[in-house]
Curated annotation (Swiss-Prot):
Residues 35-191 form the Ferritin-like diiron domain. It holds the Pfam family Ferritin. It is an enzyme of class 1 (oxidoreductase). Keywords: Disulfide bond, Golgi apparatus, Iron, Iron storage, Metal-binding, Oxidoreductase, Secreted, Signal. One of its GO terms (molecular function) is ferrous iron binding. Fe cation 1 binds at residues 52, 87, 90. Its EC number is 1.16.3.1. This is Ferritin heavy chain. It comes from Papilio xuthus (Asian swallowtail butterfly). Stores iron in a soluble, non-toxic, readily available form. Important for iron homeostasis. Iron is taken up in the ferrous form and deposited as ferric hydroxides after oxidation. Ferritin is composed of a heavy (H) chain which is responsible for the oxidation and uptake of ferrous iron, and a light (L) chain which facilitates the nucleation of the ferrihydrite iron core.
C-alpha cells in the first residue's frame, strides 16, 4: 500500500495540471544511438498504419451494410466485421513495432487520420467480395512498398523489419486474397445454379450452417 501511495505522490510531483485531463512531464534526455530506422522506411510504416486503419473502416461499413434490415445477410456481416477487427489489429501491430524501435516518442495522433470509407453500399454479395479482394490486393501492394523502402535505403538495410513484414503480414495477405477469390468464385457458381437463392444459401454457409 505504501508503494502505491509513493508512486501516486511521485506522479503528482511531476505533473502540473493544465486541465482536468492533462499534465506536463518534463522530457528526459535518452541516448538516440539505438534508434536506427531511416526516414523513408519510417514514413512508409506510418502510411501503412493509415492504410490498415482505412481498410478497417471500409470493412466496418461493409458489415453495417449487410446488417441492415432490408438486406439481412448476417453471414456477410460477420465476415466483414471480423475483417475490420483484423485490419485494426494489423495497425496496432505496426504501432507496437514502431514503439519497440523508439520511433514514437512524441504525439502519435498524426498516425491515425479518420477518413470516410470509399463506399457505403454494394449491389450484391459478389460485388462486396470483389471489392474486398481489390482492397486487400492494394493493401498487399502497400506492404510490399514498405518492404522495398526499408531494404533499399543505402544508409541502413532494415533486415529485421523486412523479415517481420514478410513473415507476419505478407503470408496472411496472400492467404486472405486466395480465400476471398475462392468465396467470390463459389458464390458466382451458386448464383448460376440457384439464382437469387444462391446468395441466401451462401450467407448461411458463411455462418457455418449446413446447406
Amino acid at each position: 500500500m505504501k508503494a502505491v501511495l509513493f508512486a501516486v505522490a511521485a506522479l503528482l510531483a511531476v505533473c502540473i495540471p493544465i486541465s482536468a485531463k492533462q499534465c506536463n512531464v518534463n522530457p528526459v534526455n535518452i541516448p538516440k544511438g539505438w534508434i536506427t530506422m531511416q526516414q523513408s522506411c519510417r514514413g512508409s510504416m506510418r502510411r501503412q498504419i493509415q492504410t490498415e486503419v482505412g481498410a478497417s473502416l471500409q470493412y466496418l461499413a461493409m458489415g453495417a451494410h449487410f446488417s441492415r434490415d432490408g438486406i439481412n445477410r448476417p453471414g456477410f456481416a460477420k465476415l466483414f466485421f471480423d475483417a475490420a477487427s483484423e485490419e485494426r489489429e494489423h495497425a496496432m501491430k505496426l504501432i507496437d513495432y514502431l514503439l519497440m524501435r523508439g520511433e514514437l516518442e512524441t504525439d502519435v495522433t498524426s498516425l491515425i487520420q479518420i477518413r470516410a470509407p470509399e463506399r457505403k453500399s454494394w449491389e450484391s454479395g459478389v460485388d462486396a467480395l470483389e471489392h474486398a479482394l481489390k482492397m486487400e490486393t492494394e493493401v498487399t501492394k502497400s506492404i510490399r512498398s514498405v518492404i522495398i523502402a526499408c531494404e533499399s535505403d543505402p544508409k541502413f538495410n532494415d533486415y529485421h523489419l523486412v523479415d517481420y513484414l514478410t513473415g507476419e503480414f505478407l503470408e496472411e495477405q496472400y492467404k486472405g486474397q486466395r480465400d476471398l477469390a475462392g468465396k467470390a468464385s463459389t458464390l458466382k457458381k451458386m448464383l448460376d445454379r440457384h439464382s437469387s437463392l444462391g446468395e441466401f444459401l451462401f450467407d448461411k454457409k458463411l455462418l457455418g450452417m449446413d446447406i
